[in-house]
Amino acid sequence: EAFDYAFKDGSFTQAALIIKDGKLIYERYRGITDNEADILASTSSSNSDQSFYKDLLNQRDKDSLISSWSTAKSFTSFLIGIAIESGHINSINDYASNYIQEWSRDDRSSVTVKDLLDMRSGLVPICFNVSSGELGNCLNSSDSASGGNIVYANDQLTKCINRELATEGLKYPWYENGANEYINGSFVYSNCDTMVLGEIIFRATGQDIQTYADYNLFSKLNIEAFWWRDYELYGQSNGNYLAYCCLDSTASDFAKFGYMLLLGGISDG
């Protein structure tokens, strides 16, 4: 009954599993429905062809890759922990400017790795402007809270690094829709904060986040996962990996990661 509810038309659910005592005891999969494809086509700003979504998401099974979207942030945070354990990063209290040298000579030098992990960096959030096709400051709280749709921009990392610190006491449209003055240390959901964490891993370890995860995490869990990249030709690896989202893997492999977290970071094989 619970699975019937989870898979009802309009839920967009395509996979669900139950893990008990480390064992997979139930799983169900389905492709996208006609109604769901219609919804995607009618709300998308990039593709309004219903058949595109039906062809892309029509059949789902245990081997189908599923995109994590923002669940990838948990993987990035875990990799920061691995980098600390391996000595590449000293601690979460390190100044981010130790690795992002662009911040070392201005007020952004006070931002710590922990601030980025907690999304309390104080850096102005940026959003994708559909009309201009460019990234810029978010114009309202709703766009900011959704992550700004920066995934549509060709080069996301540069803009994420080049953000300025917000000024306490000023009103910003992205902070409570400009109704109240900004307070330092406030939580502001930000894809860019996590995108910068991916670059910190790259600069601290000398490996992009995909390569670092393949060896230090994915292989240990016996899973395969594939990170999306932006279109910056001279980035980390012919494109900068989107540390804040878009990690593709199977539902069962995602479950292995989740179960490992449930066990406090211990792999159950």
Describe each model-derived feature in a short phrase:
Residues 1-20, 219, 240, 262-269:
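Catalytic loop of the DD-peptidase/beta-lactamase superfamily, centered on the K-T-G motif
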Residues 6-57:
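A short, well-structured edge-of-sheet supersecondary motif
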Residues 21-33, 45-46, 118-123, 163, ...:
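Glycine-rich, acidic and aromatic/proline-enriched surface loops and short helix-turn segments
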Residues 22, 49, 55, 65-92, ...:
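Active-site SXXK
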Residues 38-56, 97-98, 132-182, 207-226:
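Short, charged, amphipathic alpha-helices and their helix-cap/turn boundaries
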Residues 56-57, 62, 67, 85-128, ...:
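Active-site helix/loop module of the DD-peptidase/beta-lactamase fold
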Residues 182, 190-194:
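Acidic/His-rich structured neighborhood in mature extracellular/periplasmic domains
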Residues 192, 198-199, 203-204, 210:
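Beta-propeller domains
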